[in-house]
Structure formats: C-alpha cells, structure tokens
Amino acid sequence: MDVDAEREKITQEIKELERILDPGSSGSHVEISESSLESDSEADSLPSEDLDPADPPISEEERWGEASNDEDDPKDKTLPEDPETCLQLNMVYQEVIQEKLAEANLLLAQNREQQEELMRDLAGSKGTKVKDGKSLPPSTYMGHFMKPYFKDKVTGVGPPANEDTREKAAQGIKAFEELLVTKWKNWEKALLRKSVVSDRLQRLLQPKLLKLEYLHQKQSKVSSELERQALEKQGREAEKEIQDINQLPEEALLGNRLDSHDWEKISNINFEGSRSAEEIRKFWQNSEHPSINKQEWSREEEERLQAIAAAHGHLEWQKIAEELGTSRSAFQCLQKFQQHNKALKRKEWTEEEDRMLTQLVQEMRVGSHIPYRRIVYYMEGRDSMQLIYRWTKSLDPGLKKGYWAPEEDAKLLQAVAKYGEQDWFKIREEVPGRSDAQCRDRYLRRLHFSLKKGRWNLKEEEQLIELIEKYGVGHWAKIASELPHRSGSQCLSKWKIMMGKKQGLRRRRRRARHSVRWSSTSSSGSSSGSSGGSSSSSSSSSEEDEPEQAQAGEGDRALLSPQYMVPDMDLWVPARQSTSQPWRGGAGAWLGGPAASLSPPKGSSASQGGSKEASTTAAAPGEETSPVQVPARAHGPVPRSAQASHSADTRPAGAEKQALEGGRRLLTVPVETVLRVLRANTAARSCTQKEQLRQPPLPTSSPGVSSGDSVARSHVQWLRHRATQSGQRRWRHALHRRLLNRRLLLAVTPWVGDVVVPCTQASQRPAVVQTQADGLREQLQQARLASTPVFTLFTQLFHIDTAGCLEVVRERKALPPRLPQAGARDPPVHLLQASSSAQSTPGHLFPNVPAQEASKSASHKGSRRLASSRVERTLPQASLLASTGPRPKPKTVSELLQEKRLQEARAREATRGPVVLPSQLLVSSSVILQPPLPHTPHGRPAPGPTVLNVPLSGPGAPAAAKPGTSGSWQEAGTSAKDKRLSTMQALPLAPVFSEAEGTAPAASQAPALGPGQISVSCPESGLGQSQAPAASRKQGLPEAPPFLPAAPSPTPLPVQPLSLTHIGGPHVATSVPLPVTWVLTAQGLLPVPVPAVVSLPRPAGTPGPAGLLATLLPPLTETRAAQGPRAPALSSSWQPPANMNREPEPSCRTDTPAPPTHALSQSPAEADGSVAFVPGEAQVAREIPEPRTSSHADPPEAEPPWSGRLPAFGGVIPATEPRGTPGSPSGTQEPRGPLGLEKLPLRQPGPEKGALDLEKPPLPQPGPEKGALDLGLLSQEGEAATQQWLGGQRGVRVPLLGSRLPYQPPALCSLRALSGLLLHKKALEHKATSLVVGGEAERPAGALQASLGLVRGQLQDNPAYLLLRARFLAAFTLPALLATLAPQGVRTTLSVPSRVGSESEDEDLLSELELADRDGQPGCTTATCPIQGAPDSGKCSASSCLDTSNDPDDLDVLRTRHARHTRKRRRLV
C-alpha cells in the first residue's frame, strides 16, 4: 500500500472524528485512540497462536459508539471549548500520526526482509537466516521433509496406502525404518527430559497467562473503582501463581509416568523429526521416567518375577509389575523375563542358516555393499547385527584364519603407525583378509612394544594372584592394566596354568574356529555404536571366555580363598565297606582282632600277588617272580590302588567278591611287593627315557638324495629345527611329569596297605622262567665300583689304606672265588618253613621271600650311582646257590678287606688263651648297645669296642626303613625264609638317621649273623653320639635328643642274656660261663671259638680290655628260668620293627659262614595273633623317664658308669641292675640318648690292656683335614642346616613334657588303619559315654561332650595320656592328609603341572632320570625311611636312593638336593 494513500485515509478519518466529536469529548477521544493504537500494536507483536480465537473482534463503529455513549461523563467535560484548545489538540494528533507512520514503515521493512528470506529458502539459497523469535513457518522443520512426501497442506495427511503397503501391514511386516532401532544417547536422554519439563511448564502457565490477559482487558473497560480494584486483585493473584509455577522444581514438573504431553511437538520441534512421537512416548513411559527403578535386578527379585509371571500365565505384565512392587515398569518385567527364558534364547548358528546367509549375500550384494537389513526379512529369528557378525567374523570367504605371516605383521604395524591404535576398522583395510578384531588382538597380544614375553617371575605371579583377588576371575583387562608388560590373554593363560588346566585336554575339547557361533542380541548390537571393530572383538572374547570363566569360578575360589574349612569327622567315615570283611588294616586288626589278610599256602611266594594287569607273572608255589621282567608300561591295578589311596578301604571289596564268586584264590600282596614292581617299572622306564632324551635327532634325509644336494640338506636342517623346537618341549614335559608321578606313587604307596588280588595263572608264561636270582646275577656281572662321595666317606671314616687295598685286589684278582668254608651250616628246615606263617602277622611290613633267592649286590651304572648302596641279606648255605649254577662273581674291595681281617684274626686267635668274661645282663633278643669310647691321653678315641645300633621291633608295630644308595640301611632281623638269620644293621650316612637316632654313619658291613650273635664294629674315629658323646663333640656334631617312650604294650618282649665286658667299671660277676663268638676290635670283627671262652669274675680294679665281648644266649625258653625275678617295667615300648623282609644288597659281602643258630620258641603274642612279634627282630625301646626335679641339674660327673646305666629294653629291667643304681642321686634314671643310651662320662683307660688286646699295626694319625667329618659328604645342604638335622630338632612336640615324639611309619598308620578306626568311631563314642555318670549319660550328645570334658579335666597333666594322644596324632596326620588327595587323573585346584623349560633343562631332566634310574633298581624294595625314634620320618639323605620324601614339609629340601634349578619344579603344597 502507498504511504500517501494511507496518509490521505488517515486525514479523512481525522476529519470525520472532528465532525462527530463535539468540543466536550476531545480528551476521551484521545485516550481511546491511544489505547486502541497501543492495543493494535501489541496485537501485531504477539504471535498468532497466542491470540485468543474465542474473543470476537471489536469494530470501529462499536468502539466509537461506546465512546459516544460515555460523552455525558462529567470528568470528560473539563476542557474549555475555545479555538486555542482545538489547535493544541490538532498538534497532538499530528504527533500521533507521525509515530504511527514510523511504525508502519518499520513493519513494512521487516515484511520485505522476511519475504526475501523465505524466497531464498525456497530457492535453495544458503544465506544467513534472520530470526526474530517468532514461530517458523510449517515448511521449515525437518518433519516437513519426511514421509509422507505428498500430504495435504491443511490437514497434513498423506495419500492412502497402496495395495502393497496394505498387504504388508496385514501380514505384520514393518518397514525398514521401523526395524532400525537406534540406541538412545546421553544427550538425547537429557534433551527428552528438558523437553518434557518445558512442555509441562507451558501447559501449566498457558491458562494463567490467558487469565491475566483477560483481566487486563476487562480492567481497561470497567469504570467503577470497586470493580477496578477487584480486577487488580485478581491480576495480582494470577501473577503470583505464574511466579509460583516458574519456581517449581524440575522433579515436580516431570509429572507422572503416564501423563500426556505434546509428543508431536516434542518430536518435530525439540528432536527435529529424528525420533517419532510414538518412539519418544514409549521410551519415556517405559524406561526414562524418574519413577522407574533402573538398578540391577537382584536374584530374589528375579525369582519373584518368575513366580508372579507364572501365576498370571505370563500375561498382563502391567499387573505383574504392580504386584512385584519394586517400581519396575511392565516393559522391564517382560524384558527381564525374556532374557531368562531358555525357550526364547537364540541358539547357535546351524549349517542351514550359514548356507542361506551365504546365498543371500551373494545374490543381494551390490559391489561391496551388503544390505543386511533386507536380508533379515529372509532370516527368521536373526537381526541385522547378528548377520553382520556372522558374515564378517566367520563366513566371509576372503577372511583368513590361523597363523599370521610376517608380511601381515609388517602391514599391521604400518597401519597402526598410520591410523593409531583405535581405528581398527580402517586398519583392517590395510591388512587384507583380516578382520578388525583379528588385527586388534594380534597387535595388542603379540606385537605391542610394551609386551613382555617368556617366563613369569615370582613377583609377577604374586601380583597376578593379588589382582585376581581384587577384581575376580574374568576381568583380565583390568588385571592386565595394573600388571605391567602383560596382556589380558597372558594373564588368562597363566591363571589356567596355575589352576592346573591341561593344555592337551583343552585343545581336544576346544571347537574349531569356523564352528564358533556368534550370537548377540539386537540390543547389544544396537549398543555397539560406531566402533564396530572394538565391539566385535569384545563380543567375541566375551563369548569365548564365558564357559571358561564359569568353569574357573570354583577353582579360583578354591585357590584364592583365605578361609580354611575343617569338615566334620563324620564325613571321613568310609561310605562303603566289604560285607565279608568289614575292616582290614594294613598293619593289623583294630581293637585287638587278628589281622584279616588272606595269605597263600605255605611255600608260596609273596610275589604271586602281582596283578595280571601289571604284567607280573604269577609264580607257582615255590617259584618267584623277578621284578626285572616287569615291563615298564605297568600301570595296572597296583599303581591305581596305590594312587587312589583315599578309597583304598573300599576298592578291594569288589575284587574279593568277584574272586570268591569265581572260585579263585585270593592273595594278599604286601606293600613291598608292590613297591618292587613299581621300582622295577620306574627303573626300566627311566633308562629308556634317558637314552631317548640323550640321543641326538636322527637325520631325516630321504633315500635317493645325494649328500651334496644343497636343497636336500636345507630341507633336512629345516626338519631338524622344526622337530627340535616343537617336539622337544612337549617330550621333556611328558617325561618330567611321568617321572614325578612315579615318585609320588612310590612315596604314597606305603600308606595304602596291602593289596588283595585274585590268584590267576598267567596264560602266556615263557618256557624258561628267569628267576630273581638270575636277574641279580646279571646285574652283579655288570657292577662297577665307582668313586663316589659315599666311598670317600667310607675311606675317611675307617681310615682305609686305599693303596694297600689296590695291591690286595691285584694280588687276588687271578684267584678263584672262595668257596664256603666247612664250618658253614645250613639253617634248619623248620626255619625255612616258618616264613609263610609270618606273612600274615601284622608285625611284618615286607613279605618273606623264598630260599631260592640269592644274595644281591648293588648295580652301579654311571658316575652318579653310589657305591656300597645296598644292604644285603646273605644265606649261610652257599651250596644252595652253587646247586643252581651261578657263575663266580668278582669280589668287591669291602669283601676282600673283610676276608683279610678275618684271616688275620684267626691267626691271632690261635695264640690266645681262654677269655674271662664277667657280668651278665638281661636285654632283648636283638638289642645291640654302644658303649662310649674312652679317650687316650693324646685326645683321640682309643680303639675300644663298640656294638652297633639295631632298629628294634615291638608287637604289632612294623616299621618301614628306606634303603640308601650308600648303604644307609642294613637290616637286623629275619631273612625271607630264615627268620632267625640276622643281618648287620649299619649306621646310616644320611641326616635322616643322624637326626632320628643321633648317630652317625657306620663303617663297612659285617657278614650275616644269627640271632645268637651280636654284630659289632669299632671304627677308630667314631661318629656322633652312637659311640661316645665326646666323639660327637670332637667332630662338631650335635647330640640328638633322647627318645620318648611309646605307648604301653600288653606283652613284654622276650629277652636273652647278654654278656658284656668292660673291665674299667664295677661289675657283679656271675658264675655262669657264657660263650662269646664274635669280638670287634679296630682291625675288624673277629670270630672266637666257643670252647676258648670262659666266664670268670674279674676284680673291679683290673684294667679293662680293649674289646667288648658280647653274645646272646641260645633260646628264650632256656634262659627264662635263669632270669630270676624281674623288676616291674616302667613302660613297654610300642615301636615299629625294622624292615625284616627286605632284600638288601650290601656293598661288602663275605663268605664267612654264620655260626649255628637256635630256634626260639614263639611268644604268646604270636600264638593268639593279636600282637605280631617274631624272634630275631629288633626293638627300639627304653624306659619312661620318671618325673624328677633335680635330674637336669645333676652334673655329668655324678652319673654312674655306663655299665651300671644300661637301659632295660622291652619293658624289662636287668636282673643285675637295681632300681636305684649307685651314683644316681635320685635313684631314678634320667632321659637317655639315642637308643636309650645315657650321656656317659669319659673314662681314661690305664696303661694295661686286657686279655683281648690284640696286636694290630699302628694306624696312621689323621691330619686336621682328615680328622673331622666332612659334612658335605652327608648332605648338599649347608653345614648349619646339616648340624641342625643331625641334632634331631623335628617331630611332634608333646605338650608339658618338653620333648618331641617321632612320627610313625606308614605300615602302622596306613589309610586302611585310618578307615577301620573311623568305621568304629560310633562304637568308641558309645563306650566312652560309660565314663559319665548321672543324668547326662542318657543324652548321647551330652554324654560325649561330658566324657571329653572329663578326660581333659583329669588327664590333661598325665604324661601317659599326653604321649598316647601325641602318638595317635603322629600316626594318623599324614594318612588324613593323603586321604584328601585325589588319585591320578582327577583334577584338583592345586594340581599344578611342573613346567619344563625349552633348552636349558636337558641336564636337569637327565639328572632326574638318573635319580629315578638309581632309585628304581630291583634291589631297593622299600620306599620310605621312617624308623622308630626318628624325629622326622619323612627325611631322607641326599646319598640315599629314595624317590621323594614322605613328609610334605620336606619337599623343598629334597628338591634342592636333586636339582640345581628349584624354580622349574616348584609346586603349590
């Protein structure tokens, strides 16, 4: 419109106004015109949508009419009606018109700008937009350009759906856009919250604003003052309400969950059409509203949900959510139910699905673009993310799998340097054939510069365990972030190794890569975001590790749990037991019952018990099976029964039942037979494995290729390198594990007890049976004497003239072997027949062997095999061996020296006169004592006599002794068929015996003696406390603590008179002449003819002889009457016997015949079977020291001479020794040293010599370097540790007594004995309730507790009770530990495999195999070395042939001796 025309129009309106108005209404006209102009301007400024459409517009006529109606108002008639007033009014009108014209011009300019901007937008112009805060046109928001593209401009409704759309809607098929579910981002959630608050605020303020506007309009129209004041008051209230609404908090503005909002406005304006209104509403009402519980679901809540949903039939989820009452929405309840519903869980991809996906991708792909969303239509039950994962990770033909080539690694490193370590989607394009997950894993786990490869040190392992405790299993990324230079996969692999997971088993059970089924839900796929590579790798790793984490959860808790759970004693009771034999102990029956063991008939060999599966041929009666013939692959029932020690009491029941039903005979295979088989198998296996390991790799060049062909040589070298790198590690690992398993088997076997197997005849028995003697003969022929530390120790101990020995060897090398002398007599036949009856006695740990068994000597192979390593049991009838036709064997140095000494002794005896022997003492049948050696004026021990220690036996308490490779043990007891033949018991060379007995190793071994003789030996440089405390102090060896008395025994041991002579001390002479047959001097053991010895009293002042004469009277029945009344026994010893039935191999043999032996009558304990005691066995015993207060304060000078302080063995005090001996202040005996010997005072002998002071060549004086014992020959430990070991400071501490109690041997406390004791637990508890009197006895539980309290109250200070309790705990502690161990093949959490290195461990493994080869010789028939009195029965010497220690606490000690690198064989104990 033109401005001039508008001005003209206004002018006309003014004239019309002047004509209408009279002079009195000019003020009112101006006021109304001004208000109308202001209202018009305000109306123009307000948005069109804010106007109230209900108010009709007011026309100018009505407005002027209203004004004319009010002209009679008296207040409007105040202006004068003159021309001057009219001129002034005209000037006012002109100013108003100018203002209106300026405003109109401004509006026209703005309109033109808006038109131009709109035209630019429609034309596609990108110019800057000018916004004045007004609402945008409908075509400027994003929703205008979305579907439907063609819609009505007024209603916004699009065209009707076509036929295709209607068909899809009828079938429920959604559009592609509806299938796309985009994850809500955080900024979108914040925007939704802000939008809801804004919409709510606008809904609350809109009525108030309209009300306020109406009040303002009405106020302007009223003329009454009262109405105006009322309207003003209402306006102020409306403004206050608006102000209160603006001050409402955000939580109040959010409203309820189901409140209605303008979702279309929020979708179009706030979200600009990116989210649909329905999607926004559902997300707000089901997930995002603050009233909805967004915390994790608890297990209790999930269980309640399952129950409530089942009650409602899995329908009406709104009611289910309300009934659940945890502020969960119905959608959340349904979603959680679907997650835990197994029927809705997606399964692995099938081959049909893989084939369909491959076909669809090939048909529908366009170049490199694959329309996964369209393919989803044809893949029922799968979403697009699953298709992407399956195709890109598994089915893509261009995807490479397996090892990475060096070229690929180089490309990967270049791509990482180019794009960084995050953008794996771009990096995969640089490495063709590899996915983003493969590239990421390869780089982070293998190629990263900060990764550390190789072995884990101890610090890293400790840190790994701490981090696993902190974060738990499965959080390997967090663990690796705090563990420097280690990746998550390395931590997982190390944890699996620590948990004992076998890699071979894992490789067999692990599925191939192409069969891995990727299954991820749509929500997880939508949550992956833009980082496709990282999300795929994390999903794949999580799915692969999920079963491993589930399996590893329990092992982790077992490994890292700081708590220790002690199960109830009732859980230890065996669940099953044999119906025919309810309980059978390995060492004898419990509760006084006879030993329930089925023995073969007399004359049959105990070796018949070898099982068929173990390839031990069952020998006929009288025959014997050689352990040499047992193949190395023996893993039959014998090893399994030994390994499955926790169920040893129940397993034989099935075999016995089957054997009884089949009518076959049952054989009780003793432990030593099982050990022989195992040792033979171990030796053969070790030899084979050692040779295979030492053999260099054979050339693999194929025939027909010349040696000069370079291609063939390179191929051969490549094959060798490949075989060396890949195969040697697994080979060494397998050898090492087999070696350790065999050692563990040998160590645990003695605690299993005897094995009962059916007697079956071997179907394929060779025509010519090679006996054990034949095998030993072959080994003796190959025996070589090597110089070893033990041989050096012998030479130092006995001061052997090596040069003279060599000369003697050279002189007698050509001589034929010496035949048995005419004085040799065969043992009585009844002694040979008595062995079968001894097999069933519980006192025997090892079986008797037939008389055809030949004496064995050590088989020395290699430089590390020790000379003088076996103890030997020789039979006096050498003609029996000659009849079988053995070839003559060369004699060893020890045999030649022994023969030389015997010949010299016989020559001297011819010139000697009768020997006078005084006093007689009563001791046990096989007790051998050690008197002290008096010192010479020069300070070195005089060549006095001594008697060797012999491990002694008690009723029902067999002991196991381990044979040492250096002659560490020799037996005193019965042989296989001749129980009356005694073999010499030499002192051990290991710290075991030094700690147990307090004695040092003995010298060479003497010939086998009968029970009527005492084997003695007197080296000049005695060792330890066994010969004299002074000798041990001189050599720096600590004295061992005294023995503790054992539990009482119901039957006293048979005793025989022992004639001892030591003229230096007071004696009481007897008138009974005693024959003496052996005398030990510095030159050796000398036989004395019986007629040449006369027993006469000797004055007390006469000088003592240099030799000690001792003999045992023939039978017990002949001497029982001469014993006289015996003093009451303070305590009968209950000690395990020595291993009487071993097959020792001595390092020195002699053909000197044994004197005639006499059969001893069987004790009553043997007759009834309750206590097994065999005459000839040795019993370590001593008296219980009576409590005394001044015994420790007494000086050594106050002690009586040694001859008056001899202990009483077997609970019998010598008849010639009074209760209180002279010189004992308190009349009681103090605790004695090893084997009951006191700390004896030193005595200086006079210049005179006794009748038996034989002439001998003077021995060379040892120098300072030869006088002291080299502790390095005893043990590889330090000198301080060896001396502590020798001091015997280990064992079970007995409270209130200040002493230690040695552990019991395995034969006494086997698993069978423990299981039998547990089977009688209820009966023992029932009997214990009889101790309680009164009303408490009626209640079983209260009676048991009352009886326990009674025992604690009355016996807590009783020494006998304390000893009995300590003995019981010492007996059954180790079997209880073994009962918790699983057998071979059963995985436990602590079964950590030993790790073997790659190249640096060949020497260690070879040394281990050599040790196993040396340990597994057939001559070694025992596996444990505990002996009564040893404070730690599990300790064994480094020079012995023991496999492993039986004490778990000493595994590390033995491990440091057998190998240089202990870290390669560390175990979690």
UniProtKB/Swiss-Prot annotation:
Per UniProt, the ranges with Basic residues bias are 503-516
Q: What is the effect of changing residue 1369 to A?
A: Decreased binding to SNAPC2
Effect in UniProt of substituting residue 1362 to A: Abolishes SNAPC2-binding
Mutating residue 94 to L: effect?
Answer: Abolishes SNAPC5 binding in the absence of SNAPC1. Minimal effect on SNAPC5 binding in the presence of SNAPC1
A GO biological process of this protein is: snRNA transcription by RNA polymerase III
| SUPFAM superfamilies named among the record's database cross-references | Homeodomain-like
Chain intervals for the UniProt region annotation (SNAPC5-binding): 84-133
The record places domain Myb-like at 250-288, 344-395
Cite the residue spans of the region called Disordered: 16-82, 501-558, 577-661, 685-710, 834-894, 932-981, 1001-1051, 1121-1167, 1184-1266, 1430-1449
Q: Where is the composition biased (Pro residues)?
A: 932-944, 1039-1051
- According to its UniProt record, where is this protein located? Nucleus
GO molecular-function annotation terms? Answer: DNA binding; RNA polymerase II general transcription initiation factor activity; RNA polymerase III general transcription initiation factor activity; RNA polymerase III type 3 promoter sequence-specific DNA binding
For the modification Phosphothreonine, which residues carry it? Answer: 1157
Phosphoserine modification sites are 68, 599, 626, 1224, 1398, 1400, 1440
CDD domains, per this entry? SANT
Under the heading InterPro entries, the entry gives:
Homeodomain-like_sf (IPR009057), Myb-like_DNA-bd (IPR051575), Myb_dom (IPR017930), SANT/Myb (IPR001005), SANT_dom (IPR017884)
User: Any idea which residues the entry calls the DNA-binding region?
Assistant: 317-341, 424-447, 476-499
Skewed-composition ranges (Basic and acidic residues): 1184-1195
Domain HTH myb-type: start-end pairs: 289-343, 396-451, 452-503
Composition-biased stretches (Acidic residues): 37-53
Protein's name according to its UniProt entry: snRNA-activating protein complex subunit 4
Species per Swiss-Prot/TrEMBL record: Homo sapiens (Human)
